[in-house]
Amino acid sequence: MGRAFQNRKESMAKTSDQKAKVYSKYGREIYVCAKSGGIDPNGNLALRSLIDRAKKDQVPTHVIDKAIDKAKGGGGEDFDTARYEGFGPGNTMVIVDCLSDNPNRTFGDVRTCFNKVKCKIGSQGSVSHMFDHSAIFVFAGTDEEAVLEALMMADVDVTDIELEDGKVTVFAPHTDYSKAKTALTDAFGEIEFEVDEIQFVAQNTTEIQGEEVEQFDRFLDLLNDLDDVQRVYHNAEY
């Protein structure tokens, strides 16, 4: 078994309220990405990846278009990135990435989630040193040597390549995301990526069970219910 990167479909939105919240989070992230990196997905690979991911998660086209149009206008809110770290139920390590127009409010909201499960938010760097900030690509394939050669020819600092069940998984530093994706598409054409994003990948996992699992799931629900929270990374295994 390979590295345990997060599957962002762990908690699928089942109700209309949950779906609306997912759409809102994607809309905000697409807006920020387009505003900072350009509205053309062909020139902004991060935006292209984000749009593809939104479509896979069944985000309506009008939500995506509205966010890009908003970025095109140059107006709208200013969102800042905010990252919080700490220890969750069962001494698990957690990183919470946010986009916020009011960092003080966001910090208070995230801290309340920790407090509700009798855990404490930590200082910056308290757990992130136990995660690798990685670009991750997963796609169908059988020849990891050819993949490695293509990436090395493009001077990508490959962290790891795994081959399992007819799928190739590539790990590279997050700073090499664009370079790695360009190298893969140049070498192998229009790849249909199962995973194509930047994540924090835990170096080690913490196994939880029983009541700890219930508390941890509640903790994730509390965090994901916050409008400002975009992604939650953790090292829990259960």
UniProtKB/Swiss-Prot annotation:
Primary localisation category: cytoplasm
GO terms for MF: DNA binding
Keywords (A to Z) from UniProt: Cytoplasm, DNA-binding, Transcription, Transcription regulation
Gene Ontology biological process terms, A to Z: regulation of DNA-templated transcription
GO CC terms, sorted: cytosol
Subcellular location field: Cytoplasm
HAMAP family tied to this protein: Transcrip_reg_TACO1 (MF_00693)
PANTHER family given in the database record: TRANSLATIONAL ACTIVATOR OF CYTOCHROME C OXIDASE 1
Family: Belongs to the TACO1 family.
NCBIfam families: PRK12378.1
Protein name: Probable transcriptional regulatory protein Mmwyl1_2868
